[in-house]
Amino acid sequence: MAAFTSTTTAAAASPTPCRPAALVARSSAAPLRSAAPVVVAAGLRRAAAPSRRGATLRVQAKKQTFSSFDELLEKSEKPVLVDFYATWCGPCQYMVPILQEVSEKLGDKIQVVKIDTEKYTSIANRYQIEALPTFIIFKNGKPCHRFEGALPANQLIQQIESALEVAK
């Protein structure tokens, strides 16, 4: 999993997905399960760490390992927001602090999971990920809402809340 330390200062007023030719050209006939266990970062938390200038915020991600993506969705007691990303994707890196903020604001309403599309290509193919970042909200193990592109925190929260309201 990518570390939660990279940040960018680019701002996006509207969704700006990356569409790499390699992802678009990928065959959808790939196997549905990856051979390696799925490792995700979930339950983003902020912790105070002392410094000379006062407290510094440090993000801690709770890493969990599942034998399959389906197991992760099946065992989740709350809706799951999956961020399909790549380490080379600028808008994906822009979303790192935004996802942290959203996770903090929504608390126990939703579980945030990040899936590296380069590492887990079979999962990306299964959900036909062609643009990055792509977000899919799963409720009861099934996708209920999907959107693409980098969004400010307030718009991301609106997307999540409206999807959860419709899915009730």
Curated annotation (Swiss-Prot):
Cysteine disulfide partners in this protein: 89-92
Question: Tell me, what is one Gene Ontology molecular-function annotation carried by this entry?
Answer: protein-disulfide reductase activity
Principal location class: plastid
Question: Matching Gene3D superfamilies, A to Z?
Answer: Glutaredoxin (3.40.30.10)
The record's function comment reads: Probable thiol-disulfide oxidoreductase that may participate in various redox reactions.
Query: Which family does the record assign?
Result: Belongs to the thioredoxin family. Plant Y-type subfamily.
Protein's recorded name: Thioredoxin Y, chloroplastic
| Lineage of the species this protein comes from | Eukaryota, Viridiplantae, Streptophyta, Embryophyta, Tracheophyta
